[in-house]
Amino acid sequence: MSRYDSRTGDSTSYRDRRSDSGFGGTSSYGSSGSHTSSKKDNDGNESPRKLDLDGLTPFEKNFYVESPAVAAMTDTEVEEYRKLREITVEGKDIPKPVKSFRDVGFPDYVLEEVKKAGFTEPTPIQSQGWPMAMKGRDLIGIAETGSGKTLSYLLPAIVHVNAQPMLAHGDGPIVLVLAPTRELAVQIQQEASKFGSSSKIKTTCIYGGVPKGPQVRDLQKGVEIVIATPGRLIDMMESNNTNLRRVTYLVLDEADRMLDMGFDPQIRKIVSHIRPDRQTLYWSATWPKEVEQLSKKFLYNPYKVIIGSSDLKANRAIRQIVDVISESQKYNKLVKLLEDIMDGSRILVFLDTKKGCDQITRQLRMDGWPALSIHGDKSQAERDWVLSEFRSGKSPIMTATDVAARGLDVKDVKYVINYDFPGSLEDYVHRIGRTGRAGAKGTAYTFFTVANARFAKELTNILQEAGQKVSPELASMGRSTAPPPPGLGGFRDRGSRRGWS
């Protein structure tokens, strides 16, 4: 039996759709019944995952029913809508985007949670990603942090869970979300708990840096959705505190960052324990070669959706100010800047190293500024406290490294200051994207030195494309310096022309 009354109120309504089941249906393993695999579907995917389904119980994963409003959209209207919202799609049998939450076909209890959250319309990634995910197909989503991607996979995950048999004693989760950092995992779990509460879906968050006891108890009680960092999840599996035999919906969030942080072996080990006909959703902000290669191992005939241009661009709502200064001028420049802008608003200051974060924070505090730092050497309790102080405004200045800040969803950051210029232009765009979210205005200040000169030309292009002023010093530096070679600090490919065709 299914867990819940579906849209029709019939608890078995989804169970009749055998052609869309994960096992025992068509060879497309969850694609719509009209789709047939072809060589073109597998271009660039020389070894799609091998399916040994002996002894595996069938499961449902295609729940999408196109609404009349969506069905009525002409091809021209679909093309115009995608162009307006900067949606690029690849794959076979691609569903049309949805313009409203009701068009997705979510059950009423999900729609109630969406309404309570105050959302008015789907974001671009939700508009196209929801019907793709609800069809049960594998999905590659390339979208920035803050784009609404978390709900793009969580709401279909809730529908997926409620269509499966109830957990039995000793069962592991049905949905597994892998995330690179503790902070991101906690944020995902908070959203999963909020939107899954009305259907009594149990969730837990598994990450290192804290005692295992409470996490072990959650797993042993049985939870439908687990959000985890790779290392701690493997610990739990090896100590027999959980298993992945029931996982039929797998999410890899921020896959590019997980690979950057060296999690490739752990990810491969985890996925090897999950049934091969699962549905896999693979999310990344960028599309470098190593991310593409991993996707080919884990995904079969996926949809692909890219939000935004194939080149990273800065948000036009963000005012960008780049000052060319010397290294020795940085701290005095920072203090002068804080004196000018400090109004109680949240200010996020980026530095390259943990040591630099601590040094600048210590100096600021000695000078009377309410600053705290966050980086990977701090305990989980310290990190939680720093974030709480920053979010509440008690300490409105926070210094951070890129890794520590990645995935943090702190609302109302008014200013970003790049004390140290990052190691790539992609990271520059990520950093300044911490402000100017959800239609708000923001300002990003950047200290740029001669040591950063190799980025001057491409940085100038970013500023000009976003309609920003370029200082004569930066423009001059850009004209006299060659840009970094590919793979050494420039933009990474965002995947619009490679891989799945």
Curated annotation (Swiss-Prot):
Positions annotated to bind ATP: 143-150
Cellular localization per UniProt: Nucleus
Chain positions of motif DEAD box: 253-256
Keyword Glycosyltransferase in record: no
Keywords: ATP-binding, Helicase, Hydrolase, Nonsense-mediated mRNA decay, Nucleotide-binding, Nucleus, Ribosome biogenesis, RNA-binding, rRNA processing
InterPro entries reported for this sequence: DEAD/DEAH_box_helicase_dom, Helicase_ATP-bd, Helicase_C-like, P-loop_NTPase, RNA-helicase_DEAD-box_CS, RNA_helicase_DEAD_Q_motif
Short motif Q motif, span: 99-127
Annotated EC: 3.6.4.13
Catalytic activity: ATP + H2O = ADP + phosphate + H(+)
GO cellular component, one term: nucleus
Role: ATP-dependent RNA helicase involved nonsense-mediated mRNA decay and ribosome biogenesis through rRNA processing.
Protein name (Swiss-Prot/TrEMBL): DEAD-box ATP-dependent RNA helicase 20
Organism in which the protein naturally occurs: Arabidopsis thaliana (Mouse-ear cress)
Gene assigned in the entry: RH20
